[in-house]
Amino acid sequence: MMDKESPQFKMLKLTLANLDWEDEGEAWDDSAFLPLPDRESLTDSEREDLDWVVARDRRKFANMPMVRDRFDFRVAPLFGALLQSPRLARLWAESGDFFITAKARGTMNEMDRAWLDMALVPLLVNGWVQSGNIAVAGGLGITAEAIEAIRQDRLDVLAPEARKLVDLAQAVARGTLGADQFKALASEYGTKWVVEAIGYVVFRIGSAIIDSVLWQVQGIEGGPHIVDEMITALAEGRLGQQNMFDKEGFARDRLKSS
């Protein structure tokens, strides 16, 4: 059963703001959402990219159990904006798919990515990105106490394995990852793993910025308060089993479509 007051549901109202939320008391200005470009204005390759991204967004929607059976599919506002440049939209989507399928390729697993994401909670500019990652991390067993410790820079309380991943992500974000730290990580995880982890952190930071900007230009304001709501809900055991986005299901679908 969908809890309409849950932080997950509030986030979906932002992520998919162009769905018909009228019965939920939300009133978004439809005129602010960027329409998909006129196909006749695109080159053949741009039309191919547009179709690829729309099909990918449809697969993603099909893996959102809280909304897929209630609403008709629409391209989410983020990709509605990115698709003004179809090639950019496809490159961005393919980058995300590359990281979400990392486990199948033998590099980062879901828990690895979750700790890298939690390391960025105090550093990102977009509350929505942080909150979504917190919901995923909580589902994997990362506690609210651990997330708060990262927010408060009390990294010494983290388990050694988690601390290594948090230190890596924050060093990348701050531009301080040096040769010694890189070599130590590479000797434990493998050079390919570390390079992909660096790429993932950079992608996450970029995603937080571009998501925030492309939402704002379409009149969607999330605000940082949802981060505190999500952590409180996790601490109080209120997140439950509500899954905003079945990442593993999407990853399987993505690999099948390759």
Residue ranges and their predicted role:
Residues 1-112, 223-258:
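Secretory/endomembrane lumenal or extracellular ectodomains immediately following the signal peptide
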Residues 26-29, 69-70, 90-94, 125-130, ...:
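Short acidic alpha-helix initiation/capping motifs at coil-to-helix transition points
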Residues 191-242:
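Preference for long, well-ordered alpha-helical segments
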Residues 98-99, 121-125, 155-157, 175, ...:
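A short structural micro-motif
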Residues 161-199:
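Acidic/histidine-rich alpha-helical segments that form the ligand environment
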Residues 108-116, 193-196:
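Alpha-helical scaffolds flanking conserved acidic
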